[in-house]
Regions:
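Terminal accessory/targeting
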Residues: 1-6, 16-126, 136-243
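DG-centered beta-turn motif at the end of beta-strands
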Residues: 9-12
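Gly/Ser/Thr-rich loops at beta-strand to alpha-helix junctions
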Residues: 131-135
Protein backbone atom coordinates (compact mmCIF):
# COMPACT_ATOMS: atom_id res chain seq x y z
CA UNK A 1 0.00 0.00 0.00
CA UNK A 2 1.21 3.51 -0.78
CA UNK A 3 1.52 6.45 1.60
CA UNK A 4 -0.67 9.53 1.21
CA UNK A 5 -0.60 12.72 3.27
CA UNK A 6 -3.23 15.46 3.64
CA UNK A 7 -2.16 18.67 5.40
CA UNK A 8 -5.26 20.60 6.47
CA UNK A 9 -5.52 24.07 7.98
CA UNK A 10 -8.35 24.19 10.51
CA UNK A 11 -10.09 27.40 11.66
CA UNK A 12 -10.30 29.22 8.30
CA UNK A 13 -12.63 32.17 8.87
CA UNK A 14 -11.93 32.36 12.60
CA UNK A 15 -10.12 35.69 12.25
CA UNK A 16 -8.32 37.80 9.65
CA UNK A 17 -4.90 36.53 10.78
CA UNK A 18 -5.97 32.93 10.18
CA UNK A 19 -7.36 33.81 6.74
CA UNK A 20 -4.13 35.48 5.63
CA UNK A 21 -2.06 32.50 6.77
CA UNK A 22 -4.28 29.99 4.97
CA UNK A 23 -4.18 32.00 1.75
CA UNK A 24 -0.39 32.29 1.84
CA UNK A 25 0.08 28.60 2.59
CA UNK A 26 -2.10 27.64 -0.37
CA UNK A 27 -0.23 29.99 -2.66
CA UNK A 28 3.05 28.53 -1.41
CA UNK A 29 1.86 24.95 -1.97
CA UNK A 30 2.32 24.07 1.71
CA UNK A 31 -1.19 22.77 2.50
CA UNK A 32 -3.71 20.66 0.62
CA UNK A 33 -7.00 21.76 2.16
CA UNK A 34 -8.62 23.97 4.75
CA UNK A 35 -11.86 23.80 6.72
CA UNK A 36 -13.95 26.92 7.24
CA UNK A 37 -15.81 27.97 10.40
CA UNK A 38 -19.04 29.31 8.90
CA UNK A 39 -20.33 30.82 12.14
CA UNK A 40 -17.26 32.98 12.83
CA UNK A 41 -16.98 36.76 12.25
CA UNK A 42 -14.39 36.46 9.47
CA UNK A 43 -16.13 33.68 7.53
CA UNK A 44 -17.34 36.12 4.86
CA UNK A 45 -13.76 37.16 4.12
CA UNK A 46 -12.75 33.50 3.93
CA UNK A 47 -15.56 32.85 1.45
CA UNK A 48 -14.48 35.84 -0.65
CA UNK A 49 -10.91 34.52 -0.70
CA UNK A 50 -12.20 31.18 -2.01
CA UNK A 51 -13.83 32.98 -4.94
CA UNK A 52 -10.72 35.05 -5.63
CA UNK A 53 -8.37 32.08 -5.32
CA UNK A 54 -9.92 28.89 -6.71
CA UNK A 55 -6.83 26.92 -5.70
CA UNK A 56 -8.17 26.96 -2.14
CA UNK A 57 -9.66 23.50 -1.50
CA UNK A 58 -12.19 24.01 1.26
CA UNK A 59 -14.37 21.96 3.57
CA UNK A 60 -16.59 22.84 6.53
CA UNK A 61 -15.23 22.91 10.09
CA UNK A 62 -18.51 22.08 11.88
CA UNK A 63 -18.52 24.24 15.01
CA UNK A 64 -20.53 24.10 18.24
CA UNK A 65 -18.14 25.89 20.63
CA UNK A 66 -16.74 29.41 21.03
CA UNK A 67 -13.69 28.80 23.19
CA UNK A 68 -12.09 32.25 23.50
CA UNK A 69 -12.76 34.52 26.49
CA UNK A 70 -13.39 37.81 24.68
CA UNK A 71 -14.10 36.73 21.10
CA UNK A 72 -17.34 34.79 20.76
CA UNK A 73 -19.82 33.51 18.20
CA UNK A 74 -23.05 31.58 18.35
CA UNK A 75 -25.36 29.26 16.43
CA UNK A 76 -26.50 29.97 12.89
CA UNK A 77 -29.64 27.91 13.39
CA UNK A 78 -32.65 29.67 14.91
CA UNK A 79 -33.56 26.41 16.66
CA UNK A 80 -30.51 25.69 18.79
CA UNK A 81 -31.46 26.58 22.35
CA UNK A 82 -29.44 23.75 23.90
CA UNK A 83 -26.26 25.02 22.20
CA UNK A 84 -26.39 28.51 23.74
CA UNK A 85 -24.86 29.68 27.00
CA UNK A 86 -26.45 32.33 29.23
CA UNK A 87 -25.11 35.08 26.93
CA UNK A 88 -26.47 33.47 23.77
CA UNK A 89 -23.12 32.28 22.44
CA UNK A 90 -21.86 28.74 22.00
CA UNK A 91 -20.38 27.21 25.15
CA UNK A 92 -16.66 27.59 25.74
CA UNK A 93 -15.94 23.92 26.40
CA UNK A 94 -16.65 20.65 24.60
CA UNK A 95 -17.66 19.10 27.93
CA UNK A 96 -20.51 21.61 28.27
CA UNK A 97 -21.76 20.82 24.77
CA UNK A 98 -21.65 17.07 25.44
CA UNK A 99 -23.62 17.60 28.66
CA UNK A 100 -26.10 20.29 27.56
CA UNK A 101 -26.73 19.90 23.83
CA UNK A 102 -29.34 17.61 22.34
CA UNK A 103 -28.84 15.67 19.15
CA UNK A 104 -31.50 17.54 17.20
CA UNK A 105 -29.88 20.93 17.84
CA UNK A 106 -26.42 19.63 16.97
CA UNK A 107 -27.64 18.24 13.65
CA UNK A 108 -29.70 21.35 12.84
CA UNK A 109 -26.69 23.56 13.47
CA UNK A 110 -24.45 21.42 11.28
CA UNK A 111 -27.02 21.64 8.49
CA UNK A 112 -27.33 25.42 8.92
CA UNK A 113 -23.58 25.81 8.53
CA UNK A 114 -23.59 23.59 5.44
CA UNK A 115 -26.41 25.65 3.95
CA UNK A 116 -24.56 28.91 4.64
CA UNK A 117 -21.45 27.66 2.84
CA UNK A 118 -23.56 26.50 -0.09
CA UNK A 119 -25.15 29.95 -0.33
CA UNK A 120 -21.66 31.37 -0.79
CA UNK A 121 -21.49 29.24 -3.97
CA UNK A 122 -18.21 27.66 -2.94
CA UNK A 123 -17.62 24.02 -3.94
CA UNK A 124 -16.75 21.94 -0.88
CA UNK A 125 -16.34 18.23 -0.40
CA UNK A 126 -15.64 17.37 3.23
CA UNK A 127 -16.55 18.03 6.83
CA UNK A 128 -14.62 17.87 10.06
CA UNK A 129 -15.51 18.88 13.60
CA UNK A 130 -14.15 21.69 15.77
CA UNK A 131 -13.23 20.45 19.26
CA UNK A 132 -14.92 17.05 18.79
CA UNK A 133 -18.41 18.15 19.78
CA UNK A 134 -19.95 15.42 17.58
CA UNK A 135 -18.04 12.56 19.18
CA UNK A 136 -21.21 11.10 20.71
CA UNK A 137 -23.20 11.53 17.49
CA UNK A 138 -20.92 10.00 14.87
CA UNK A 139 -23.46 7.70 13.23
CA UNK A 140 -25.97 10.53 12.80
CA UNK A 141 -23.21 12.72 11.37
CA UNK A 142 -22.08 10.03 8.95
CA UNK A 143 -25.65 9.40 7.78
CA UNK A 144 -25.89 13.08 6.91
CA UNK A 145 -22.54 12.96 5.11
CA UNK A 146 -23.75 9.93 3.15
CA UNK A 147 -26.92 11.75 2.08
CA UNK A 148 -25.01 14.86 1.03
CA UNK A 149 -21.95 13.18 -0.50
CA UNK A 150 -19.38 14.49 1.98
CA UNK A 151 -16.32 12.79 3.37
CA UNK A 152 -15.68 13.19 7.11
CA UNK A 153 -12.58 13.38 9.28
CA UNK A 154 -12.61 10.06 11.13
CA UNK A 155 -9.54 7.85 11.42
CA UNK A 156 -9.67 4.07 11.16
CA UNK A 157 -6.65 3.86 13.47
CA UNK A 158 -8.48 5.50 16.37
CA UNK A 159 -9.01 3.56 19.57
CA UNK A 160 -11.88 1.28 18.60
CA UNK A 161 -12.56 0.14 22.16
CA UNK A 162 -15.10 2.99 22.29
CA UNK A 163 -18.30 1.41 20.91
CA UNK A 164 -19.38 4.55 19.05
CA UNK A 165 -16.02 4.89 17.31
CA UNK A 166 -15.92 1.28 16.20
CA UNK A 167 -19.52 1.45 14.97
CA UNK A 168 -18.88 4.71 13.13
CA UNK A 169 -15.82 3.36 11.31
CA UNK A 170 -17.76 0.25 10.31
CA UNK A 171 -20.68 2.39 9.11
CA UNK A 172 -18.41 4.60 7.00
CA UNK A 173 -16.72 1.63 5.38
CA UNK A 174 -20.00 -0.18 4.74
CA UNK A 175 -21.68 2.87 3.19
CA UNK A 176 -18.77 4.16 1.12
CA UNK A 177 -18.09 7.32 3.12
CA UNK A 178 -14.49 8.39 2.62
CA UNK A 179 -12.51 8.53 5.87
CA UNK A 180 -8.79 8.55 6.59
CA UNK A 181 -6.56 5.87 8.06
CA UNK A 182 -4.50 7.97 10.47
CA UNK A 183 -4.97 11.35 12.14
CA UNK A 184 -1.62 12.63 13.29
CA UNK A 185 -1.07 14.62 16.48
CA UNK A 186 -0.46 18.29 15.85
CA UNK A 187 0.46 21.49 17.63
CA UNK A 188 -2.45 21.10 20.08
CA UNK A 189 -0.05 18.93 22.06
CA UNK A 190 2.25 21.88 22.78
CA UNK A 191 1.23 24.12 25.73
CA UNK A 192 1.69 27.76 24.82
CA UNK A 193 3.99 28.46 27.77
CA UNK A 194 6.36 25.64 26.79
CA UNK A 195 6.09 25.96 23.04
CA UNK A 196 9.06 26.56 20.78
CA UNK A 197 9.13 26.55 17.01
CA UNK A 198 11.93 23.97 17.08
CA UNK A 199 9.83 21.60 19.19
CA UNK A 200 6.92 21.46 16.78
CA UNK A 201 9.18 21.46 13.71
CA UNK A 202 11.08 18.45 15.02
CA UNK A 203 7.83 16.71 15.96
CA UNK A 204 6.39 17.17 12.46
CA UNK A 205 9.60 15.99 10.81
CA UNK A 206 9.65 12.87 13.00
CA UNK A 207 6.05 12.07 12.07
CA UNK A 208 6.82 12.52 8.39
CA UNK A 209 9.81 10.22 8.66
CA UNK A 210 7.58 7.47 10.10
CA UNK A 211 4.45 8.04 8.03
CA UNK A 212 2.48 4.77 7.83
CA UNK A 213 1.01 3.27 4.69
CA UNK A 214 -2.46 4.49 3.84
CA UNK A 215 -4.03 7.96 4.10
CA UNK A 216 -2.76 10.20 6.90
CA UNK A 217 -3.92 13.69 7.81
CA UNK A 218 -2.04 16.40 9.70
CA UNK A 219 -4.31 19.19 10.89
CA UNK A 220 -2.83 22.53 11.86
CA UNK A 221 -4.07 25.96 13.01
CA UNK A 222 -1.94 28.50 11.15
CA UNK A 223 -2.23 32.24 11.67
CA UNK A 224 -0.14 35.30 10.87
CA UNK A 225 1.35 37.01 13.93
CA UNK A 226 -0.68 40.13 14.68
CA UNK A 227 -2.16 42.16 17.52
CA UNK A 228 -5.55 40.77 16.53
CA UNK A 229 -4.39 37.19 17.04
CA UNK A 230 -2.65 37.98 20.34
CA UNK A 231 -5.83 39.60 21.66
CA UNK A 232 -7.94 36.58 20.70
CA UNK A 233 -5.93 33.44 21.35
CA UNK A 234 -3.76 32.61 24.37
CA UNK A 235 -2.12 29.95 22.18
CA UNK A 236 -1.14 32.50 19.51
CA UNK A 237 2.53 31.42 19.53
CA UNK A 238 1.53 27.89 18.55
CA UNK A 239 -0.67 29.15 15.72
CA UNK A 240 2.08 31.41 14.41
CA UNK A 241 4.44 28.43 14.61
CA UNK A 242 2.02 26.34 12.53
CA UNK A 243 2.18 29.07 9.92
Amino acid sequence: MRKYLIINADDFGMCHSANMAVLDLFQSGCIHSTTLMACCPWAKEAAALCHQHPEIHVGLHVTHTAEWENYRWGPMSSQAASLRDEEGYFFHRTEDVLYQANSEDLMREMQAQVQWLRKQEIPFTHLDNHMLTLQNHLIETLKYCQEEGFSFRLARAKDQTHPQTAAAIAYADTHGIAIIDYLNPNSDRFPNDRYTYASIRDSYLAMLAHLPEGVSEFFTHPAVESEELKAIAPDWRVRVGDY
